[in-house]
Curated annotation (Swiss-Prot):
Quaternary assembly: Monomer.
Entry protein name: Peptidyl-tRNA hydrolase
UniProt source species: Parabacteroides distasonis (strain ATCC 8503 / DSM 20701 / CIP 104284 / JCM 5825 / NCTC 11152)
Stored Pfam families: Pept_tRNA_hydro
Database matches in SUPFAM superfamilies: Peptidyl-tRNA hydrolase-like (SSF53178)
Protein's GO biological process: protein quality control for misfolded or incompletely synthesized proteins; rescue of stalled ribosome
Site positions for Stabilizes the basic form of H active site to accept a proton: D91
Sites where the protein binds tRNA: Y15, F64, N66, N112
Known function: Hydrolyzes ribosome-free peptidyl-tRNAs (with 1 or more amino acids incorporated), which drop off the ribosome during protein synthesis, or as a result of ribosome stalling. Catalyzes the release of premature peptidyl moieties from peptidyl-tRNA molecules trapped in stalled 50S ribosomal subunits, and thus maintains levels of free tRNAs and 50S ribosomes.
Length: 187
């Protein structure tokens, strides 16, 4: 089976380490965990890795966040991957920091990257792994918060959370979404 695993983030070194780029960070960790690496290809950085009997195309789009759907649609079509085998890794303000939630479908929850993907795929029925970044910001401070870097106390917890996110992605490919949600969403 072939899967497209896409981490959402903004391009540019000034965004590295920001909350909004946690999708890139998660897929970097996934690829490193199996000794793979990324190469620049059309619409983004691509890694081709294998997890047991699953072929994973791992994508970090090089489009702006709100145009991520262009990259996702291109790679689904190019690799002939069904939407059921798509997983988007995305930051989520509605979840406390470090909470990971796998969902089989859903709304964009105001996330412009997800909004664009749903628009270009003409469906919201694709899986997403939501990484909680919390919402500890004053009224009107959302943009500064998501584009801000993680504080030291959260960075300290990051390796364990990234390991767990990697386990979830591997399980999604090997066992399917329902078993993976049952196993990980309540932890």
């Amino acid at each position: 089976m072939k899967y497209l695993i896409t981490g959402l983030g903004n391009i540019g070194s000034e965004y590295w380490g920001t909350r909004h780029n946690i999708g890139f960070r998660v897929v970097n960790h996934l690829v490193e965990s199996v000794g793979g690496n990324f190469t620049e290809e059309r619409y983004g950085a691509i890694a081709r890795i294998r997890v047991k009997n699953c072929d994973l195309i791992v994508l970090k789009p090089n489009t702006f966040m709100n145009l991520s759907g262009n990259a996702v649609r291109y790679w689904l079509q190019k690799e002939n991957i069904p939407v059921e085998n798509l997983l988007i890794v995305v930051d989520d303000l509605a979840l406390p920091f470090g909470t990971l939630r796998l969902k089989p479908k859903g709304s964009d929850a105001g996330h412009n990257g997800l909004k664009n993907i749903a628009q270009l795929l003409n469906t919201q029925e694709y899986s997403r792994l939501r990484f909680g970044i919390g919402s500890d910001f004053p009224r009107g401070g959302q943009i500064d918060y998501v584009l801000g870097k993680f504080p030291p106390e959260e960075l300290q917890l990051m390796p364990e959370i990234l390991d767990r996110a990697t386990e979830i992605i591997k399980s999604f490919c090997l066992a399917g979404i329902q078993i993976t949600m049952n196993q990980f969403n309540n932890k």
